[in-house]
Amino acid sequence: MKYSDLRDFLRALEARGELKRIQTPVSPILEMTEICDRTLRRSGPALLFEKPIGFDMPVLGNLFGTPQRVAFGMGAEDVSELREIGRLLALLKEPEPPKGLKDAWDKLPLFKKVLSMAPKVLKDAPCQEVILEGEDVDLGRLPVQHCWPGDAAPLITWGLTITRGPNKERQNLGIYRQQVLGRNKVIMRWLSHRGGALDYREWCQKHPDRPYPVAVALGADPATILGAVTPVPDTLSEYAFAGLLRGQRTELVKAVGSDLQVPASAEIVLEGHIHPGEMADEGPYGDHTGYYNEVDRFPVFTIERITRRRDAIYHSTYTGRPPDEPAVLGVALNEVFVPILQKQFPEIVDFYLPPEGCSYRMAVVTIRKQYPGHAKRVMLGVWSFLRQFMYTKFVIVTDDDIDARDWNDVIWAITTRMDPKRDTVLIDNTPIDYLDFASPVSGLGSKMGLDATHKWPGETSREWGRAIRQDPAVKQRVDELWPLLGLD
């Protein structure tokens, strides 16, 4: 099923029993976080707080609190269908020459569809039904969550940040958290390798004395939101990818105060500029690691204009010790990553990012091993192939007889197929998430690879053990006897 805007999605979720309206007054200060956290841990519904204490704007939380709802948002009926999206992205990332005329003819509709998904620009849009400027710009009127007791200030969490570099035609979409500093200022926390930060750096190099235009959309349609967190090829815009997910072109409208184009159906849009040299200390905030992060300096975004729907909904989330909403997103997007990795490394059977590993800090890979040193090649490939894995600290590689998603299997492989000295790969001075306070230097640390595969000649001089397996005939015989044994 496809959704034209956030409200269309909410209606569909409500019809499925996947949305709960909360009419009891609830505070966005701490209380919503606790309610959403308990609900997510029970795989509960999305929550629409209709009476947030102190505000007249409803708050939407836990929207992507189950992998199934992420799949719904991407236009799929089941999480397993997300692998098809991964196969599409793998093909678009590295298209293969057609094997013949028939193959070229078969692929033609796909590429025609991609080319037809350029965004559609409207003259008028729901996101600009109300326009607030000057002294009317006041973030204090938005029910921005204050998530944890030690947080520095309320935090905008689901802001879809729209930027464009000075040398680029297409825009970048990214989700970056934003600490509220005052009536019209937030801190734009984007890590240095993210698209928004790269666009801003290029702008500062080319126009060091000019303010940088930025727009932030809150409450976009699910395909556009999820397109911003999916590994889209650099040649494909997130807006075009969202159109592919939705099955229709993404509708945009020109921002009131800049040339940026924003989602026409968004609930709220913040428009403004980052002024040269204006920085501020961000944090501390409770983060997806389960800890409060260190204070660090980031650019300040000055909001000059708020446009919104007349009856806008504020979309929010929280981050904390897994599972949280980013961890759930990671579980679902894991299925998208698998075909992309397999396109580059066909020997990969499965790839798993355990949610307990904060979505990306640990990966388990199963392979069809073909030669000595193969596991090490795969480790290095995972770290370097997609920028989503540049912060992955631990990569475990094992054989395809192991279930990557079953810790009992993985731990057995590690403890029986590894020699700690021979089979551990350590790499120093690599990029690390600055939120990782375990690293010796902010943003720079080490990585560990664990080779838990069977060892081939050249990797060991010893006879390798043979795994114990029962005789299949005996297993079948016991299957027949089992109902008679009274053991169930």
From Swiss-Prot:
Pathway: Cofactor biosynthesis; ubiquinone biosynthesis. InterPro entries: UbiD, UbiD-like_C, UbiD-like_N, UbiD_bacteria, UbiD_Rift_dom. It comes from the Bacteria. One of its GO terms (biological process) is ubiquinone biosynthetic process. GO terms for molecular function: 3-octaprenyl-4-hydroxybenzoate carboxy-lyase activity; metal ion binding. Binds 1 prenylated FMN per subunit. Its EC number is 4.1.1.98. Gene3D superfamilies: Single helix bin (1.20.5.570), UbiD C-terminal domain-like (3.40.1670.10). It is found in: Cell membrane. It is a peripheral membrane protein. The keyword Flavoprotein applies. Coiled coil: none annotated. The active site is at 287 (proton donor). Its cofactor is prenylated FMN; Mn(2+). Its main location: membrane. It catalyses: a 4-hydroxy-3-(all-trans-polyprenyl)benzoate + H(+) = a 2-(all-trans-polyprenyl)phenol + CO2. The keyword Membrane applies. Belongs to the UbiD family. Catalyzes the decarboxylation of 3-octaprenyl-4-hydroxy benzoate to 2-octaprenylphenol, an intermediate step in ubiquinone biosynthesis. Homohexamer. This is 3-octaprenyl-4-hydroxybenzoate carboxy-lyase. It comes from Azotobacter vinelandii (strain DJ / ATCC BAA-1303). The lineage of its organism: Bacteria, Pseudomonadati, Pseudomonadota, Gammaproteobacteria, Pseudomonadales.
